Amino acid sequence: MKKIYIVDDSVKLRKRLYELLSEVDNVQVIGQAGNADQALDDIRVLKPDTVLLDIRLPGKSGIQLLGEIKKWQPEITVIIMTNYDYPQYHQQSIRAGADHFFNKTREFESIIEVLKR
């Protein structure tokens, strides 16, 4: 069973992802957060296999959180999902250790497909 943690400031998006992922075999959403600080605390305790991470979060950016996750637990797969797919965000995310980078508006289904693998 692949354990997933969702980090996005949009409650609607977290709910949508949770509902979609609950239909995917061998995938379990073990937690979710709307900000980076709560997410980091939860991730340290819950130890997910994969984190779905938005870039724009209250308090700290998703890219900063990504760096902290990878420094602490480099084997966690981190999928960046954003509405702001600017080239500089993509480059910063990959440099910080992102495993995938998706536009959550245009490539939402691709996120789900990656998790099915």
Tell where the protein language model's regions lie, with residue ranges.
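Short amphipathic alpha-helix used as the core "switch/output" element in two-component signaling
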Residues: I63-Q73
